[in-house]
């Protein structure tokens, strides 16, 4: 259940933020929130997170569907007490679903978080995916260590 709740919350927050950006900005508009550090900048991204692989929507739609299918499968395999793994998969699934929605209905992904310290603009869904993948890597490393100790 935690996976579904997390997916729903991530998707809803992502959707609300994107609708607010689309309704209040024109593409390319940038508003400084913290000058020279953080701006809200509305861009339509034809690629992956952080503008990588532009124009490859045909790769990302099936990839997101496969990720979501894998998470549905995992829902039934992960013990209930492994709540952190369930939360992690919910973050990844919610982010994947948020960007999949954009690709299917807009043709590009709405990005708006613009930290001036690097040239990438991203969104809440991207952040959820990155945090989820980071947590997944940590959990996998911890599990590997645990298995090595029992051998």
Curated annotation (Swiss-Prot):
Pathway: Protein modification; lipoprotein biosynthesis (signal peptide cleavage). The chain crosses the membrane at residues 33-53, 58-78, 87-107, 120-140. It comes from the Bacteria. It catalyses: Release of signal peptides from bacterial membrane prolipoproteins. Hydrolyzes -Xaa-Yaa-Zaa-|-(S,diacylglyceryl)Cys-, in which Xaa is hydrophobic (preferably Leu), and Yaa (Ala or Ser) and Zaa (Gly or Ala) have small, neutral side chains. Its EC number is 3.4.23.36. GO terms for molecular function: aspartic-type endopeptidase activity. Pfam families: Peptidase_A8. It is an enzyme of class 3 (hydrolase). InterPro entries: Peptidase_A8 (IPR001872). The active site is at 111, 126. One of its GO terms (cellular component) is plasma membrane. It is a multi-pass membrane protein. It is found in: Cell membrane. This protein specifically catalyzes the removal of signal peptides from prolipoproteins. Belongs to the peptidase A8 family. This is Lipoprotein signal peptidase. It comes from Desulfitobacterium hafniense (strain Y51).
């Amino acid at each position: 259940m935690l996976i579904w709740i997390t997916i729903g919350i991530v998707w809803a927050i992502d959707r609300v933020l994107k609708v607010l950006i689309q309704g209040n900005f024109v593409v390319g508009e940038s508003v400084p929130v913290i000058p020279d550090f953080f701006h809200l900048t509305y861009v339509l991204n034809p690629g992956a997170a952080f503008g990588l692989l532009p124009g490859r929507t045909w790769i990302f739609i099936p990839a997101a569907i496969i990720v979501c299918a894998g998470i549905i499968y995992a829902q039934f395999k992960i013990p209930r007490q492994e709540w952190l793994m369930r939360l992690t998969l919910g973050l990844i699934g919610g982010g994947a679903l948020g960007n999949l929605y954009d690709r299917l209905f807009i043709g590009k992904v709405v990005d708006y978080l613009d930290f001036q310290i690097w040239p990438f603009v991203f969104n809440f869904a991207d952040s959820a995916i990155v945090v989820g993948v980071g947590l997944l890597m940590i959990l996998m490393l911890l599990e590997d260590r645990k298995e090595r100790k029992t051998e």
